Amino acid sequence: RKNVEWNGHHFSSLVLDGGHNADALEALALQLEDWQFTNTTVILGMSGDKLQPVLIPMLEKIFRSCALLIACPFDSQRSVKPKELLRFLHVEIGSEKLPKTRTVRGAEEALGLAAESKENPLVVCGSFYLAGEVMQLLSD
């Protein structure tokens, strides 16, 4: 979606993607490349059982256009803690290849942080749960 308003904030472009496996993340990476997004803010939340090295090449492609990566939990016991998610990414990808990173306590805080970079496209990905929470916040 383009020109999304939330809580007095404006996002120029917003992509909600529930993909959480290699094929889905590859499709997202290709789509972001096709749209020529730059300086993207990515809100990423994942289930602990999905933290697999096989996802790294796809995540690296997504992060190429990323200026800020926000690690965000979602309301499920399966959600990986944000610091654990970033630790996994730092080990598997390397700190030098990651964009600027932040952790938050939930989707509302993540949207607030993303709103500070309002001209940047926003991509929410990694979990249907997280995408659903963001959709709910945007519809309130």
Segments and roles (model prediction):
Residues 11-14, 56-121:
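C-terminal helical cap/extension that packs against the catalytic core
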Residues 110-139:
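A glycine-rich beta-strand to alpha-helix segment
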Residues 44-48, 73-74, 126:
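Cofactor-binding loop segments of dinucleotide-utilizing enzymes, especially the Rossmann-like FAD-
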Residues 27-29, 55-57, 82-84, 135-138:
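Short amphipathic alpha-helical segments
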Residues 1-68:
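Nucleotide phosphate-binding/pyrophosphate-handling subdomain across enzymes
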Residues 32, 89, 93, 138:
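Active-site catalytic pocket residues across diverse enzymes, especially alpha/beta-hydrolases
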Residues 24, 51-52, 78-80, 111-113, ...:
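Short active-site-adjacent structural elements
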Residues 18, 45, 104, 124-125:
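Active-site-adjacent beta-strand anchor residues
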